[in-house]
Every structure is written in C-alpha cells, then in structure tokens.
C-alpha cells in the first residue's frame, strides 16, 4: 500500500489524480463533444470574411458610354453616395450597360446594405431615362469573385434561343433560389425575341419613316386591363386579341395605307424569330452554348451552396428535353475539397510524426501512449468549441490544428518527463505523479498563457486580414488551452496508473542504444555550456548579432501578401483593337480557343464575347480555362499560364491576359490581372493626358508584367452634328433625331410579348446588311411639320471621331485602373515600390489621386501593421510573464530568445525562394510563442534550485540546462515535426500552407541550437546586474 503525500502535494492536479474514473469520464465527454461538433462543422476553403458587396446593373441598349454615364450611372451614384457604411463605390459605363459595384464595411450586415441599396434605387428612379427597358437590378454578389460553378447547355437539335428560354425558366430560376446563391447569369445572348429589320429603301420609296412603323407596332401590341361586365346574375371578364405572339403575326401587321392599299410590316421589313441581342455569344470549348455561371453571396459557404445545387441538378436536367445537354464544366468545390483533404492528411501525418518522436525520446510504450492520447483529445475537443463559435473546417483552421500537434504534446511531455524522473529516483508512481505534477504545474501555466498571449494581437488585427486569421488564432488558442487542461488532469492520472520503475527500466536494444546516444549528447552539451559560460560577452555578442541579422533580413527579404494558389481554374481576358466589330471579335476568340484547347493541361474552356454588364466592350472577351486535376497534369498553374500566353501571342490582333482563380477575393472589379493601381481625377481630359504616360513607364519596369489599363478612348464614333436652325424651320426636334437614330441602329426594344411563363421583346433596327458602315446614316428619314419626308443628311453632317468605349468612376469621380502581374523573380513588395517610384518621377498634378486596389491595398495595410503586430505580441507576452514571475527581469531573459527564431525563419524563407507574406508572418509570430518555452523550462528550474536548495545562480542554471535538455529537445522536435508536413506539402493548396511550415521549421532549428547557450548566459548577466543594483540601492531594497 502506497503512503500518500500530504494533501498539499500535487496542486490542482491532485483531485484528478486521486479520482481516475471521474477524470476519465470527463475526458470522454470532451472527446464525444468534439466528435459531435466535427459532424456539424461546415467545410470551406478559407474563413468567410467577404466584404458585403452589391452589384447594380442597368441595361440601356443602344446608348453610348457618355449617355449611360450621365443619364444612368451619375444619378444612381449620387443616391448611393449618401448611404451609411459604404466603403467604396466603383462603376463602369459602357455601350448599353451601367454597372455600379458597392462595397460596404465589414461590420454592416449584407441584408441591411441590401435595404439601403433598394431605397437609393427608388429615390433615383425619377431621374433615370423614361424609356429604360427595365429598372436597375441589384445582386448580392461580388463581380470579381469567380463563379463557384459553371455549366454549359448545348443542343444539336434545338435553336439556342429556345434552349436559353427553357434553361432560364426551368433551371436558372430554381438555382437562384438556393440559399447562398447571389447571382445566376446566362451568357450567350440567345434570349428569344421578334426582330424587325427595316428595309430603308422600301420605307423611303413609300414615304414612311421608322418612327411611323415603331408607333404602329407599339400601338398594335398591348396588354392592359379592359374591365368586366357586372350583370344582375353574373359577371363577365373582358379580353381581346390585343397581343401578337409570333413573327408571322407581326409580319401581317398593317403599318400604313397608301392610295387605299394596306402596307404591311412584311412589305417594308424582314420579321423573324431571333435573339434579343445579336452582339452576344458564348462557347463551351468550340461549341456554341448557353453558359450558366453561378456566383455566391458574400459570406455564403461555397461547399454548402454547391452541394445544394448538385443535389437539385438531376431533377432540373430531367425537366429538359433529351436533346438538351447540360454539363458541369467547373466546380470550385472540387479543388477546395482536395485542398482540405490534403491538409487533413498532413494533420494526421503530423500526429504520427509527433508520436514517433515521443517514443524515440521516451523509449517506453506506456510513456508514449500517455502524450499520444493527449494529442487527439486536445484536437478533437477543439471541434466542439469551433461549432459554438460558428467556425468552419478550412485550410487555416486545419493548419492551426496541424501546428497545434507539436504544441499540445509539449505540456504532456514536460509532465511525463518530470514524473518519470521521480519514479526513476525510487518514488512510487502515485507519489511521483502528485509531486511531479505539483512541481511542474506553474511551468505548464506559464507555457500555456505566454503562448496564448502571442495570439492575442491576431484577434485585434483590423480589416479583412484580421477577420481571416481570427479563426486560426482562436482555434490554436483553444487547442493549447485544452492541452494544458489535459496535461494537468489526465496526463498525471495516467502516469500514476501506467508508469512504474520496472516499465521505465525495461530496455531493449533500441532503447539502450538511444539512451547511450542521449547521454553522450547531454555530456557534450554540458562541456560546451561550461565553455560558453566562461565567455559570456562573446555569447552576448552572438545574441546581439542575431538581433541585427534579423533586422537586416527583414529589410531585404522579398515581401508578398497572400500566396498565389493553384486552384485549377484560370480567368482570362482577350483584348483586341478598340474599333473591332462583334463578328471580327468572335472570329479572333475562336482562333484563340483553338490554341488553348491544344494545351495538354487544359480540360475545358468557356468563352464569351459582347457587352452585357459583365463584359465592358465589344473588343473584350472573357475566358475561363479549367485545368485538369493537379495529379493529371505535369505543370502548375503559373507554368501553364506562361505557356498559353506564349502560344496565343502568335495569333494576330489580340492580347491575352490570364490570372489563376484564388480562394481569397478582395477586389470588386473584374481585372485582367492579379493586381491593380487606380488613377482618379476630376475630369476625363486629365486622365487622357497622364494614363498613357504612366502605362508606358510601368511597361518598362522589370518588376511588372502584363501591364495594361482599362482606359479605352480610341473607339470609333460617328458624331451627328445637327443644324438646329434648319431642323427647327422644318419642325424637327432633337428628340425626333434621337428617336430616328435609335430606331435604326440601337436594337431598340419597342414592345413586349407577354406569355404565361416569360416575357419577350420586339426589337427594331435597320437592316444594316444592305447599307453597311457610315453609309447607313444616309438611309435615316424624318418627318417634317408639313408631313414631308426629310433625309438626315438635309439637316446634319456626320464626322468620324474617337470616343471612349467605357467610362469608369471610383467614388463618383472619373478613374482608370492599371492592371499588372508580378514576374516570378520579383515580389509584390518590389512591384509596389517600383510603381510608387515611377509615379514620383511623373510628378502628377494635384487633381489626380492614386491608390492601389484590392489585394495590393490590403498588402500595404498588412505590411504597415506587421511590425506593430510583432511588437504587440512581444509586449503581451512580457506582461503575462511579468505577472507570472512577479519580476521585471526574468521576462526579458525569456524574450531574449526571440531574435534567434526570426533569423532562422527569415533565412529558411529566403533559401527556399519564398516571400515574407501574411502566412509566413503568422508563422514568425507563433515562433515567438514557441521558442521562449526553452528559456521558461530552464529559468523555472534554476529559480527553484536557488530558492529551495540554496544553489548559486551559475550552478542552478547549469543544472537546469542539463536536467531540462531532454524535454527541451523533445518538445522542440515535436513542434518541428508538427510543422514539417506543411513545409513538405505538395498537393492542392500547398502554396498556402508551405510558407507557414518553412518559417517554423527554420526558426525552430536555429533557435534550438542558439537558445541552449544564450539563455543561461543572459540569465547570469541579468542576475549579476540585479546584484549590483541591490548593492547600489540597499535602502530602497530594504524598504521594498
């Protein structure tokens, strides 16, 4: 029977050691709660930290960019600008379309923003053109966020107009109703319509005008209330044949009489069933298709949204005819799942490596099982808290848990090693557990809270980066906290029941060999430590040298924002000369598609040409290139992009800009490249002067590639200069002129055909195939006040000018965005610096403002906050350690280890060719918390030896270093192996995980070597300093 130690022995662990059943059941409860929590955790690529963003689209077919800007965009902007919580407003006004993108503060709920946007639209309604086909439509979507799913709908038996009609009514509307879906767009422009192509010569010969015919059509096709008859016994509803439904009916419409004979619409026009907009087209690979892009609402979970769509797709496809084919061309969740799966594998590998290193050091199966139980218990228990906090299983939280495998085992190792030491001295297991756990309890608390203190500044980081890493920091802190609880409860209880002197003495060939190796290493360390302690100033010089080297490396290392991921999807923009026609642009797009589809890494391609609110001009085409899975291709996305751009460069008359799709989208504008720099001015004239100069200068910089701007002011325009005096004498107003031109060349939507399921338009235009180019203007006729027919040329002259293809605004002022990529051999930090230097050399006038946008702006903010973040982490840790040790000096000794971690991390990043990005910075902050544990374990034992055994400071710290050498080495190796799978990651999303692993492994290796020698030297130097201070101010010490 064991004699129990006094009740004061064991500290907070005593209750749990003495009550093994209660302790076991408590741990089982934590395990079950974590398992249940895991089942309820959603899966995503990253924490949902999107800015609340709303896009407002207004279509005005036939209107020039100038008209769209002044008549639609400006009135809307004035109303939107009054909304509270608005962070940024950008707009793009192109031919026939206005797109306003509103980005709100992170703190504003999206539903509240939606209400404000609707109220602003209502307030602006009276200021908008009365002939708008439809009022402004808003969507809760970020236009820069790539689609979560892309589907292609094709048919070899049905016309595309019929296919789109069915897809819109039977598929798109149902998908739009799915929770999390922000916008479903159908690209391809094949919406059914009745097209009326006027024969200008026939109209002129009959003495008619387009306005006469338009009025006749509008009057002949109506759908309005007619009332009812209410008799004595029954009521009768009135109806009439006031609607015309087909092209045949319109063809027979009488538009005028001449000499008593009717003139039918078919006599003066070609009337046909066609598409509402003939300047739109989409293709899937090489086949014409209706392309359906599904975008999520900001903040919606991608996996849940895509799963809901996938679940309903079979039923939706079943509702379509057999001749209609629906194919999912891209699904972002495929790569997200693969990335999360790879991270989960790395988590399991880290756990296995940590358990392996524990066995190597402890050389005992029962002693290995105890910390091996602590690892999954701490990690699984974290899931329960994650559910409560509304977190998700994503790359960052899984990275936190992977890193935590090395942390959570530290506490258990320290406890086991201390208890084992007492058992080996002859203590009974129960007494050893009580004594060892009580002795080490303060050290565990110090390790835990000082490590959590490092994470506190991450919780207070502002803007989107802070939101992004909040889940990472909290997840890691919770895992560490649970591990501390497990180490002070379950671990000593298991030690008391599973460890014994016999089991610890039991050795095999491996354990004996490893023991001899450790003894030789410890002996060699002791000899080296003796020499180091004899040369304190040289050692101090090394410590100061690491600090200076850390600062130098921090200055010179290339800096980035967020690693560029290979998600298997490439977004592309094809650019042609500004005067290109739709037909020519479609031909060029097909030529580029031929080249792209030949690449062995490409699986599928969707492309789109035309202006519809998502594409700004006819000389632009949008492409989405879907690559084969990473395992099925030889090259990563950057290599594929370089290869595709080189191949497409041989196609004449086009420029191709490509960028890989990323999980983190901060931008709100659809850009040609990864990064943007914006110029804002009070007038378009100022931009036209300075933008070309800056673009030319930036294109010369080696730090930038793919430099281009969205400034397009060389579109061809025909300026109709009306002689107002002549027009007035003839009784022709400017409204008459505009109407005549709009009827002829605007694809004017003049009437609506109503059906039970949908509404279709009647489109009016001149048949420009008969009179192409500017000569078509000669066919325009107007009616004078006397009823005579007047050709446009009688009252106006036409001159050809250059005009903008689109007009962009940023916060209501004219702006232009310069897009650029960064070559592989340069960093984003170097690119930003080169742009700012180029801007200084041009000496812009005061009315031009510049700023970076999107991820580049976030990079600047993150870089500016990094130093303060590290300082805050150090200060937080100093405060916690000062409180725990009740000392101003000992925390400084502990924190003196930090420069060694910085040197190792920065060197590792530079040698591996990695940038110092936000992921790597998080790793360095974690290192601040890890490396100080070596000093804590040394100083705790040294202080105890001085206090309890009366040892001299040098003897105490020397003994502490030797006694704690093995657990220090063990815990460092555990943390290193926990980070090793991240460093060696090669799967999907590896770009995101690797910088964290590289920085931590490098920092741990260097700090492990240096802190074993610098910490005891600095401890003694501060002790000497303290003694001198006491001798110099004895009275103050006595009073204190």
UniProtKB/Swiss-Prot annotation:
UniProt GO molecular function: xenobiotic transmembrane transporter activity
Domain of life (superkingdom): Bacteria
Record keywords: Cell inner membrane, Cell membrane, Membrane, Transmembrane, Transmembrane helix, Transport
Transmembrane segments: 16-36, 342-362, 369-389, 396-416, 440-460, 472-492, 537-557, 869-889, 890-910, 911-931, 968-988, 998-1018
Any one of the GO CC terms: plasma membrane
Cysteine disulfide links: none
Pfam families, per database record: ACR_tran
Similarity comment: Belongs to the resistance-nodulation-cell division (RND) (TC 2.A.6) family. MdtB subfamily.
Protein name as catalogued: Multidrug resistance protein MdtB
Highest classification ranks of the organism: Bacteria, Pseudomonadati, Pseudomonadota, Gammaproteobacteria, Enterobacterales
């Amino acid at each position: 029977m064991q004699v129990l130690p006094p009740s004061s022995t064991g500290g907070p662990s005593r209750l749990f050691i003495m009550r093994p059943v209660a302790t076991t059941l408590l741990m089982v409860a934590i395990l079950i709660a974590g398992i249940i929590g895991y089942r309820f955790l959603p899966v995503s690529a990253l924490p949902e930290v999107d800015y609340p963003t709303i896009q407002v689209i207004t279509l005005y077919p036939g209107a020039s960019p100038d008209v769209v800007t002044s008549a639609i965009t400006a009135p809307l902007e004035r109303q939107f600008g009054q909304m509270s919580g608005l962070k940024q407003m950008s707009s793009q006004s192109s031919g026939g379309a206005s797109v306003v993108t509103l980005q709100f503060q992170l703190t504003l709920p999206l539903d509240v923003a939606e209400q404000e946007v609707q109220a602003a639209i209502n307030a602006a309604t009276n200021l908008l053109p009365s002939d708008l086909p439809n009022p402004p439509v808003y969507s809760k979507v970020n236009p820069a966020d790539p689609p979560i799913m892309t589907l292609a709908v094709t048919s070899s038996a049905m016309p595309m107009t019929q296919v789109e009609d069915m897809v819109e009514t039977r598929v798109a509307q149902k998908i739009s109703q799915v929770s999390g879906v922000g916008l479903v767009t159908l690209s391809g422009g094949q919406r059914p319509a009745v097209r009326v192509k006027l024969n200008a010569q026939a109209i002129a010969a009959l003495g008619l005008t387009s306005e006469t015919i338009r009025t006749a059509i509008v009057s002949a096709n109506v759908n309005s209330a007619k009332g009812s008859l209410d008799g004595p016994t029954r009521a009768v509803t009135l109806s009439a044949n006031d609607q015309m439904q087909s092209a045949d009916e319109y063809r027979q419409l009488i538009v005028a009489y001449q000499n008593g004979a009717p003139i039918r619409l078919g006599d003066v026009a070609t009337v046909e069933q066609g598409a509402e907009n003939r300047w739109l087209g989409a293709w899937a690979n090489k086949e014409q298709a209706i392309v359906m892009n599904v975008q999520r609402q900001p903040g919606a979970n991608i996996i849940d949204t895509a799963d809901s769509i996938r679940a309903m797709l079979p039923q939706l496809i079943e509702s379509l005819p057999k001749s209609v084919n629906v194919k999912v061309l891209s699904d972002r969740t495929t790569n997200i799942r693969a990335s999360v799966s790879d991270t989960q594998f790395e988590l399991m590998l880290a756990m296995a490596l940590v358990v392996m290193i524990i066995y190597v050091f402890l050389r005992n199966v029962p002693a290995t099982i105890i910390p091996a139980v602590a690892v999954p218990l701490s990690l699984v228990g974290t899931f329960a808290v994650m559910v409560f906090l509304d977190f998700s299983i994503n790359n960052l939280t899984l990275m936190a848990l992977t890193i935590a495998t090395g942390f959570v085992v530290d506490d258990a190792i320290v406890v086991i090693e201390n208890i084992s030491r007492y058992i080996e001295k002859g203590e009974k297991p129960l007494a050893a557990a009580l004594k060892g756990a009580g002795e080490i309890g303060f050290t565990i608390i110090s390790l835990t809270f000082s490590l959590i203190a490092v994470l506190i500044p991450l919780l207070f980081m502002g803007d989107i980066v802070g939101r992004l890493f909040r889940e990472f920091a909290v997840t890691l802190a919770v895992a560490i906290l649970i591990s501390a609880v497990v180490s002070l409860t379950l671990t000593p209880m298991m030690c008391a029941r599973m460890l014994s002197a016999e089991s610890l003495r039991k050795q095999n060939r491996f354990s004996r060999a490893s023991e001899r190796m450790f003894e030789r290493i410890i002996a060699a360390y002791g000899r080296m430590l003796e020499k180091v302690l004899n040369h304190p100033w040289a050692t101090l010089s090394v410590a100061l040298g690491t600090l200076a080297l850390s600062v130098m490396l921090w200055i010179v290392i290339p800096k980035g924002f967020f690693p560029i991921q290979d998600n298997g999807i490439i977004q592309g923009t094809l650019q042609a000369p500004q005067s290109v026609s739709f037909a020519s642009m479609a031909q060029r797009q097909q030529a580029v598609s031929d080249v792209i589809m030949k690449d062995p890494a490409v699986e599928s391609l969707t492309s789109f040409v035309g202006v519809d609110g998502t594409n700004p001009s006819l000389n632009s085409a949008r492409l989405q290139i879907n690559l084969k899975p990473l395992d099925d291709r030889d090259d990563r996305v950057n290599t594929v992009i370089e290869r595709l751009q080189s191949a497409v460069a041989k196609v004449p008359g086009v420029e191709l800009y490509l960028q890989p799709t990323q999980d983190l989208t901060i931008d709100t504008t659809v850009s040609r490249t990864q990064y943007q720099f914006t110029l804002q001015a009070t007038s378009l004239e100022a931009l036209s002067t300075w933008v070309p100069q800056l673009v030319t200068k930036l294109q010369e910089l080696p730090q930038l590639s793919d430099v281009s701007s969205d400034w397009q002011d060389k579109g061809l325009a025909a300026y109709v200069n009306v002689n107002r005096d002549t027009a007035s004498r003839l009784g022709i107003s400017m409204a008459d002129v505009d109407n005549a031109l709009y009827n002829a060349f605007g694809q004017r939507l003049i009437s609506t055909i109503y059906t039970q399921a949908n509404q279709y338009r009647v489109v009016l235009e001149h048949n420009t195939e008969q009179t192409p180019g500017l000569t078509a203007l000669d066919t325009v006729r107007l009616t004078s006040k006397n009823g005579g027919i007047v050709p446009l040329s009688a009252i106006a002259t036409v001159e050809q000018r250059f005009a903008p293809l689109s007009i962009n605004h940023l916060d209501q002022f004219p702006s232009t965005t310069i897009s650029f990529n960064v070559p592989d051999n340069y960093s984003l930090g170097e690119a930003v610096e080169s742009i700012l230097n180029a801007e200084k050399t041009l000496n812009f006038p005061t009315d031009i403002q510049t700023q970076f946008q999107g991820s580049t702006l976030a990079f600047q903010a993150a870089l500016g906050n990094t130093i303060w973040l590290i300082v805050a982490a150090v200060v937080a840790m100093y405060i916690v350690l000062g409180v725990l040790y009740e000392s101003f000096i000992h925390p400084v000794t502990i924190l003196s280890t930090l420069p060694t971690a910085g040197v190792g991390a920065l060197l590792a990043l530079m040698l591996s060719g990695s940038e110092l990005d936000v992921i790597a910075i998080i790793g360095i902050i974690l290192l601040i918390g890890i490396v100080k544990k070596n000093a804590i374990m040394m100083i705790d034992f040294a202080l105890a030896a001085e206090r309890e055994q009366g040892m001299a400071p040098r003897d105490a710290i020397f003994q502490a270093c030797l006694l704690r050498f093995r657990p220090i080495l063990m815990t460092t190796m555990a943390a290193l192996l926990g980070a090793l799978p991240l460093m060696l990651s090669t799967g999907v999303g590896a770009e995101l995980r690797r910088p964290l692993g590289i920085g931590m492994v490098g920092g741990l290796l260097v700090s492990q070597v240096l802190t074993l020698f610098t910490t005891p030297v600095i401890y003694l130097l501060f002790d000497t300093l303290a003694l001198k201070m006491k001798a110099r101010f004895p009275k103050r010490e006595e009073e204190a």
